Amino acid sequence: MPELPEVHTIVQDLKQSRLIGKKIISTEIFWPKTLAVPTPEIFCQQVQGQSIQNVDRRGKYIIFQLSNQMFLIVHLRMTGRFQFVTSQTPASPYVRIQFNFENGDQLRFHDTRKFGRWYLVSDVEEIIGHLGPEPLLSSFTFELFEDMMKNRKTLLKSLLLDQSFIVGLGNIYVDEALWEAKLHPLIPANQINLKHLKILYHSIKYVLEKGIQARGTTLGPGRTHYYRLDGSKGEHQTLLNVFRKTGHPCPRCGHLIEKLIVAQRSTHICPICQKK
C-alpha cells in the first residue's frame, strides 16, 4: 500500500502535470464500487463541467479540490494508481474510473485489486476528520509526540500503524523507523524511555523524508506495485535497511535480519539491534 512518501510523490506529480485547471467534460465509471459516496449517477452530475483547482494530501488520502467547492478524496489502498495521458494512449483492463478533459487528456485510475475508494464530499472532515497529526509538519513537535505516547499500552508497531494516532506510516516506514531507533516492534509504547522516544521521533521524520527524496518505494515489477504518474518507479527500495531483507545482514551490526508477524503484518527486525 502506498504510504506517505508515495502519496506525496503522486500529489507532486499531479501538481506538476497539466491537470490543474482542466475541465472535466465527462466521466467513465468502469467499476462502480470504487465510488464510496455518492452514487455513480450523482457523482457524474456533480463533477460534470468542473475544473480541478488544486491537489493536496492528508495522510494517505489524495484530495482534489473542484471548482464547485466539492472535494474528491481518493484512497489508493493496495494497488490504486493514477495515469495522466492522452486519449490515444491504450487503456489497460484495470482502469476503474476515468476523467475526460476538453482537450483530449484523460486522468485514469488503475486498481488491479479493486480496493481503492473515491469520496466526493463538500466537507473533507466527513472522510478524514478521524486522522492523527501529520508527522512532517512543524506542528508535530517532540512535546506533542511525547504527550501522545503517554499511557499508551499498545504495542509500538501497532500504534504507529494506527492512522488515527499518526498519519502516513505503513509497514515499510514503520519497520525502517524502528530499525533506525533500535526499538523492537513488540515493546508497549509507554515503556519507551525519554532518550529512545526522542530517537524514535527523529527516526520517523528521517525515514519519511528519505522516502520522499527518493520518490517512494517500488517493491517490484507489475501493476500491483506503486508507480509514479508517468509510470516510472520510485528509488527508495534501493535504500531499505530491513524491510523485506529477511536473511540479509543488518547494515549496522551484520546479524541476519529476521521476519516476524506483528498486527497481522510481516515485520522485519535486527534481533541484535532491536532487542525486546
Curated annotation (Swiss-Prot):
Catalytic residues (UniProt): P2, E3, K60, R265
Recorded GO MF terms: 8-oxo-7,8-dihydroguanine DNA N-glycosylase activity; class I DNA-(apurinic or apyrimidinic site) endonuclease activity; damaged DNA binding; zinc ion binding
Reaction(s) this enzyme catalyzes, per UniProt: Hydrolysis of DNA containing ring-opened 7-methylguanine residues, releasing 2,6-diamino-4-hydroxy-5-(N-methyl)formamidopyrimidine; 2'-deoxyribonucleotide-(2'-deoxyribose 5'-phosphate)-2'-deoxyribonucleotide-DNA = a 3'-end 2'-deoxyribonucleotide-(2,3-dehydro-2,3-deoxyribose 5'-phosphate)-DNA + a 5'-end 5'-phospho-2'-deoxyribonucleoside-DNA + H(+)
Cofactor binding annotation: Binds 1 zinc ion per subunit.
Zinc finger (FPG-type): 241-275
Residues holding DNA: R113, R152
Enzyme nomenclature, EC number: 3.2.2.23, 4.2.99.18
Alphabetized UniProt keyword annotations: DNA damage, DNA repair, DNA-binding, Glycosidase, Hydrolase, Lyase, Metal-binding, Multifunctional enzyme, Zinc, Zinc-finger
PROSITE patterns noted in UniProt: FPG_CAT, ZF_FPG_1, ZF_FPG_2
InterPro entries (UniProt xref): DNA_glyclase/AP_lyase_DNA-bd (IPR015886), DNA_glyclase_Znf_dom_DNA_BS (IPR015887), Formamido-pyr_DNA_Glyclase (IPR020629), FPG_cat (IPR012319), MutM-like_N-ter (IPR035937), Ribosomal_uS13-like_H2TH (IPR010979), Znf_DNA_glyclase/AP_lyase (IPR000214), Znf_FPG/IleRS (IPR010663)
Keyword Metal-binding: yes
Recorded superkingdom: Bacteria
Keyword DNA repair: yes
Swiss-Prot/TrEMBL GO biological process terms: base-excision repair
Cofactor: Zn(2+)
Entry function: Involved in base excision repair of DNA damaged by oxidation or by mutagenic agents. Acts as a DNA glycosylase that recognizes and removes damaged bases. Has a preference for oxidized purines, such as 7,8-dihydro-8-oxoguanine (8-oxoG). Has AP (apurinic/apyrimidinic) lyase activity and introduces nicks in the DNA strand. Cleaves the DNA backbone by beta-delta elimination to generate a single-strand break at the site of the removed base with both 3'- and 5'-phosphates.
Family that this chain belongs to: Belongs to the FPG family.
Subunit structure: Monomer.
NCBIfam families the UniProt entry points to: fpg, PRK01103.1
Protein name: Formamidopyrimidine-DNA glycosylase
Organism for this UniProt entry: Protochlamydia amoebophila (strain UWE25)
Annotated gene: mutM
